[in-house]
């Protein structure tokens, strides 16, 4: 997929909560920069913006799974 950093749900589930927060922060910063480039007409690949937004959604999904107890870090590592 164009623009994806390879953040598959499996990879995300193997990360610690702190690492997920760092990835989320980085992705949000990237979306901000991409939106600015899009507004000024400098964005070459519109698909990158979509891919980063999907990465953010994946990160939020994994974080929410942990919050409500669907999966825990230990469970994910053992699978």
UniProtKB/Swiss-Prot annotation:
Signal peptide: none annotated. InterPro entries: Ribosomal_protein_uL29, Ribosomal_uL29, Ribosomal_uL29_sf. This is Large ribosomal subunit protein uL29. Keywords: Ribonucleoprotein, Ribosomal protein. GO terms for cellular component: cytosolic large ribosomal subunit. It comes from Tropheryma whipplei (strain Twist). GO terms for biological process: translation. The gene is rpmC. The keyword Ribonucleoprotein applies. Gene3D superfamilies: 1.10.287.310.
């Amino acid at each position: 997929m164009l623009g994806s950093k390879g953040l598959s749900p499996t990879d995300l589930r193997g990360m610690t909560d702190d690492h997920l927060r760092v990835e989320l922060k980085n992705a949000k910063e990237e979306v901000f920069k991409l939106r600015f480039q899009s507004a000024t007409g400098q964005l070459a690949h519109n698909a990158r913006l979509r891919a980063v937004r999907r990465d953010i959604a994946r990160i939020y999904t994994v974080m929410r799974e942990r919050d409500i107890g669907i999966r825990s870090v230990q469970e994910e590592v053992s699978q």
